[in-house]
UniProtKB/Swiss-Prot annotation:
GO terms for biological process: translation. The keyword Ligase does not apply. It comes from Rhodopseudomonas palustris (strain BisB18). Homodimer. Part of the ribosomal stalk of the 50S ribosomal subunit. Forms a multimeric L10(L12)X complex, where L10 forms an elongated spine to which 2 to 4 L12 dimers bind in a sequential fashion. Binds GTP-bound translation factors. SUPFAM superfamilies: ClpS-like, Ribosomal protein L7/12, oligomerisation (N-terminal) domain. GO terms for cellular component: cytosolic large ribosomal subunit. Belongs to the bacterial ribosomal protein bL12 family. Signal peptide: none annotated. Gene3D superfamilies: 3.30.1390.10, Single helix bin. This is Large ribosomal subunit protein bL12. Forms part of the ribosomal stalk which helps the ribosome interact with GTP-bound translation factors. Is thus essential for accurate translation. Keywords: Ribonucleoprotein, Ribosomal protein.
Amino acid sequence: MADLQKIVDDLSSLTVLEAAELAKLLEEKWGVSAAAAVAVAGPAAAAAAPAEEKTEFTVVLAAAGEKKIEVIKEVRAITGLGLKEAKDLVEGAPKPVKEGVNKDEADKIKAQLEKAGAKVELK
């Protein structure tokens, strides 16, 4: 088991280029192609995705709009951030305001921010 852990640690330390090179060497050594396996598994995974309904949303502030001060006030009320942090979030848009919220709460937050003049996206 210690040997397996060492292999995992070694693989984890590879750069992306080194990992790609390793994949190519293993394909040549074993006479297989990773692309073929991905092509076969890809459509099945894509077909299963629409069946799942999204339950957690991220409310993203896309743009502050014209009433930046009002948006900052709403961001502070929603997140509990201090004035400087809320201002930085608003000025750094697009940025997530709240993550991992249910659909109802996400819609409520979106409505609050849009009422203040912001452009908001749910992801």
